[in-house]
């Protein structure tokens, strides 16, 4: 079958393609090839800028023309590289041969072609291309979308800042809180973890076949290739070079990025489950869209499907991120090939995360606050003011206040406003203290 939205194996490229297609520019096979071309071109230019003696004749005016090879990179170019790979059976070598063909088209570059991929191993290209794709996907796709989600949560937190709400710990009534504050918990958590993610350095491996610049040093011992590599990776790619490596990246910092993303996902799972629960408790209703169906059998159903979709996709993302984080830093001796196939899946968790963020936003924007349901729960749970009463009584050195409130409230009998007021009136305290206690209600006992 021809590959399209209906025949794609992964729902990321099929059912959810409309949400994830933006990631193709970073994580598709086309994108990986393009990033490889970019790294190879910039490396050649940097050798010319050094300059190596044999490259002094390269006209600097050709640099922008060379950069246009990757700036204007087309699907036809990518296909040409795949055609070359079908012969070489080596993807990075195919990029090198493609660039030599492009040099031939320019003319006057024949003497310089052998400095394409000079002294490098494939992982000098892969372990710069992949981190660069991750960095740009984070900056251009992920950060804007997660920040949009945080902004939506903050809007609700501010809008509903004064709405009192019965808290639940262990699934049971607890001291009242405020709806806006509970949403602000997620704003706070997401912002903190996002800051941690942004602080993670994006690093790259660039140092030859076993990380020692052997080939560079034997050919040109007069140059400090470590300084060269640091400058190239930093100035041309915007990454940080890992100073000590084997043939491949240590992947420790990439793993840190994946772990940080996983923590953010975990916060989002918690958030989605809470909103799902609030809908189940009828604290929120959902906007109804004409024509939509909630169940094939039950016509009345309006399900919290967006929050469920988000939770499921975040779970998938975390499972993949976990494997990436624990597998990539482990490689036999100076390297084995297990990282290669794993790295090709870096875009997968990004896809699931983007789907989840958009589903979360969709669910949040369908919410309709149902204040009567929230207030009804508060009115039906006067036992939660027991903490307030016993705390004030402790302040006044009243004897055994906790035990007195426990005897009143820890029963299977309903605790009502009347029973609380009767308890207050029976206390051996001043009228001033009783007045202080009388104004405490489940609606007002919400802290600061």
Predicted regions located by residue number:
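A helix-coil-helix interface module used to build multimeric assemblies
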Residues: 1-213, 220, 224-232, 294, ...
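Catalytic-core signal marking the mid-to-C-terminal active-site face
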Residues: 2-29, 64-71, 293-448
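Amphipathic alpha-helices that form helix-helix packing interfaces
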Residues: 43-46, 102, 149, 153-156, ...
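Amphipathic alpha-helical coiled-coil segments and their boundaries
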Residues: 134-135, 142, 183, 250, ...
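Alpha-helical coiled-coil oligomerization motifs
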Residues: 158-161, 202, 276, 283, ...
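Short, well-ordered beta-strand elements within core beta-sheets of diverse protein domains
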Residues: 181, 255-263, 388-395
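Glycine-rich anion/phosphate-binding loop at the beta-strand->alpha-helix junction
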Residues: 193, 240-242, 246-332
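Active-site-adjacent "gating/activation" loops or surface patches in catalytic cores
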Residues: 223-247, 251
């Amino acid at each position: 079958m021809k590959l399209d939205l209906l025949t794609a194996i992964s729902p990321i490229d099929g059912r959810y393609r409309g949400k994830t297609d933006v990631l193709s520019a970073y994580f598709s096979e086309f994108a990986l090839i393009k990033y490889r071309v970019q790294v190879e071109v910039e490396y050649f230019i940097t050798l010319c800028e050094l300059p190596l003696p044999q490259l002094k004749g390269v006209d600097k005016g050709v640099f922008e023309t060379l950069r246009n090879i990757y700036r204007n990179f087309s699907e036809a170019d990518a296909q040409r590289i795949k055609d070359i790979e079908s012969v070489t059976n080596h993807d990075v070598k195919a990029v090198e041969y493609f660039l030599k063909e492009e040099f031939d088209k320019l003319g006057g570059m024949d003497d310089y072609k052998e400095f394409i991929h000079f002294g490098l191993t494939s992982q000098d290209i892969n372990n710069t291309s992949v981190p660069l794709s991750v960095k740009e996907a984070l900056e251009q796709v992920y950060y804007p979308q997660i920040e949009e989600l945080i902004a939506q949560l903050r809007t609700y937190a501010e809008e509903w800042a004064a709405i009192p709400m019965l808290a639940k710990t262990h699934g049971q009534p607890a001291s009242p809180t405020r709806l806006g504050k509970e949403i602000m918990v997620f704003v706070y958590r997401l912002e903190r973890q996002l800051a941690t993610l942004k602080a993670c350095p994006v690093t790259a491996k660039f140092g030859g076949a076993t990380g020692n610049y052997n080939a560079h040093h034997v050919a040109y011992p007069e140059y400090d290739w470590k300084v060269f590599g640091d400058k190239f990776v930093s100035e041309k790619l915007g990454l940080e070079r890992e100073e000590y490596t084997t043939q491949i990246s240590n992947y420790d910092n990439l793993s840190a990025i994946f772990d940080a993303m996983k923590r953010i996902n975990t916060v989002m799972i918690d958030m989605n489950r809470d909103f799902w629960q609030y809908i189940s408790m009828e604290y929120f209703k959902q906007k109804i869209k004409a024509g939509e169906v909630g169940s094939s059998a039950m016509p009345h159903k309006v399900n919290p499907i967006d929050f469920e979709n988000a939770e499921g996709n975040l779970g998938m993302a975390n499972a993949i991120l976990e494997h990436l984080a624990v597998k990539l830093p482990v490689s036999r001796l100076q390297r084995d090939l297990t990282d290669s196939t794993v790295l090709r899946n870096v875009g997968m968790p990004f896809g699931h995360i983007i789907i989840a963020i958009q589903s979360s936003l969709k669910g949040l924007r369908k919410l309709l606050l149902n204040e009567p349901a929230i207030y009804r729960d508060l009115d039906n749970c006067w036992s939660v003011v027991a903490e307030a009463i016993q705390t004030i009584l402790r302040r006044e050195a009243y004897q055994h206040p906790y035990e007195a409130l426990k005897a009143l409230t820890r029963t299977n009998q309903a605790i009502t406003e009347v029973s609380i007021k009767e308890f207050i009136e029976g206390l051996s305290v001043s009228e001033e203290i009783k007045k202080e206690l009388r104004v405490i209600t489940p609606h007002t006992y919400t802290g600061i």
